[in-house]
Swiss-Prot record:
PANTHER family: 14-3-3 PROTEIN
Organism: Danio rerio
Protein name: 14-3-3 protein beta/alpha-B
Residues that bear N-acetylmethionine: 1
Superkingdom: Eukaryota
An annotated GO BP: protein localization
InterPro entries (alphabetical): 14-3-3 (IPR000308), 14-3-3_CS (IPR023409), 14-3-3_dom_sf (IPR036815), 14-3-3_domain (IPR023410)
Interaction with phosphoserine on interacting protein, annotated site positions: 56, 127
Gene name tied to this protein: ywhabb
Short name of one Pfam family: 14-3-3
Length: 242
């Protein structure tokens, strides 16, 4: 199947909400070795975000059930085995994405915008791995995630407007990484607040095409800040991500 057919297949799969098919089509496009267009890049990102998102959600549900079945060994064992099955799926998906990023996407990125997009993605998928990892492998995934986010962040500050939706989305996810993975609310709040304030200060640079995307992410940054700084924040509260 040629590239345009694969892209069309991915769009059909998206409309049918068959994200595994969508991801497979966009993986094949990426393996063609040609730099992706913005549209193709977004299709790839949406596909895998949904594929991995379903497993992240399932993993959280089953982990919670596993904790609640303490005292009932048989039920707990079933929950644990099911969690491990979901974990394996999640790890395989993340390995797929990280492989594509390393082999094709980051190397082929000719524009700063693309490089930041893919390095952010690398940070995201190592973060997803770190959520289910333990011991040495957790330390490694956390380190890899932080390095990818930091590399992306440095490029975005140098080469992109503070109102650019990719720069804002990176700040959003990097701040979530600080809060959830590094347990560092101060750094999370500082990063989110700086990104929000810098964007507000340059609202006149907002590109008409990306106005909706940028303002939505700014709203998510503000929501997270409100959540993180409120004293009576419950453990169950969930952060917004891009």
């Amino acid at each position: 199947m040629d590239k345009s057919d694969l892209v069309q297949k991915a769009k059909l799969a998206e409309q049918a909400e068959r994200y595994d098919d969508m991801a497979a089509a966009m993986k094949a496009v990426t393996e063609g070795g040609v730099e992706l267009s913005n549209e193709e890049r977004n299709l790839l990102s949406v596909a895998y975000k949904n594929v991995v998102g379903a497993r992240r959600s399932s993993w959280r549900v089953i982990s919670s059930i596993e904790q609640k079945t303490e005292g009932n060994e048989k039920k707990q064992q079933m929950a644990r085995e099911y969690r491990e099955k979901i974990e394996t799926e999640l790890q395989d998906i993340c390995s797929d994405v990280l492989g594509l990023l390393e082999k094709y996407l980051i190397a082929n990125a000719s524009q700063a915008e693309s490089k930041v997009f893919y390095l952010k993605m690398k940070g995201d998928y190592y973060r997803y791995l770190s959520e289910v990892a333990s011991g040495d492998s957790k330390a490694t995934t956390v380190e890899n995630s932080q390095k990818a986010y930091q590399d992306a962040f440095d490029i975005s500050k140098k080469d992109m407007q503070p109102t650019h939706p990719i720069r804002l989305g990176l700040a959003l996810n990097f701040s979530v990484f600080y809060y959830e993975i590094l347990n560092s609310p101060e750094n999370a709040c500082q990063l989110a607040k700086t990104a929000f304030d810098e964007a507000i200060a340059e609202l006149d640079t907002l590109n008409e095409d990306s106005y909706k995307d940028s303002t939505l992410i700014m709203q998510l940054l503000r929501d997270n800040l409100t959540l993180w700084t409120s004293e009576n924040q419950g453990e169950e509260a969930g952060e917004n991500e891009n």
